[in-house]
């Protein structure tokens, strides 16, 4: 659904700003579905500050990024482009957001926090980052039962 929505916006005159990491499979796939003239990748706050776009714009985010990771960039985009189109509600990955919020709430009360998942999973890596930012500096990604 997400790529369809992004393509629809691009075909209807919008320049798409994709907030994400260039080597992430979701970003690579999304950027491969839309003509290069219609999509631009923003990875950092500076990228957002330096955009020069003179056409209608919409933004989408890599679904595995935390809300905290994207909020500052989104605010800059909204300040710079007051008529920017938000992502469709169904394009937002609530499972990812819910997990990150749960980790945020729990990690601040923990001395040790394990995330069980693949080292190649952006979701797992991001959950460790969220736990650390939320107050549990001893947060660890466990990719194998033998590592516990």
Annotate each PLM feature:
Residues 1-148:
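The feature marks the mature, well-folded catalytic cores of soluble enzymes
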């Amino acid at each position: 659904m997400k790529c369809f929505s992004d393509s629809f916006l691009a075909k209807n005159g919008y320049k798409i700003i994709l907030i994400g990491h260039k080597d992430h499979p979701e970003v690579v796939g999304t950027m491969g579905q839309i003509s290069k003239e219609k999509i631009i990748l923003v990875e950092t706050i500076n990228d957002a500050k330096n955009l020069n776009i003179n056409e209608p714009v919409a933004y989408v985010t890599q679904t595995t990024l935390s809300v905290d990771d994207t909020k500052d960039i989104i605010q800059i985009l909204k300040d710079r482009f007051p008529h920017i189109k938000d992502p469709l509600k169904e394009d937002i990955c609530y499972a990812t957001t819910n997990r990150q919020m749960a980790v945020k709430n729990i990690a601040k009360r923990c001395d040790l926090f394990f995330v069980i998942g693949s080292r190649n999973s952006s979701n797992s890596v991001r959950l460790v980052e969220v736990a650390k930012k939320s107050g549990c500096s001893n947060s660890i990604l466990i990719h194998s039962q033998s590592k516990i």
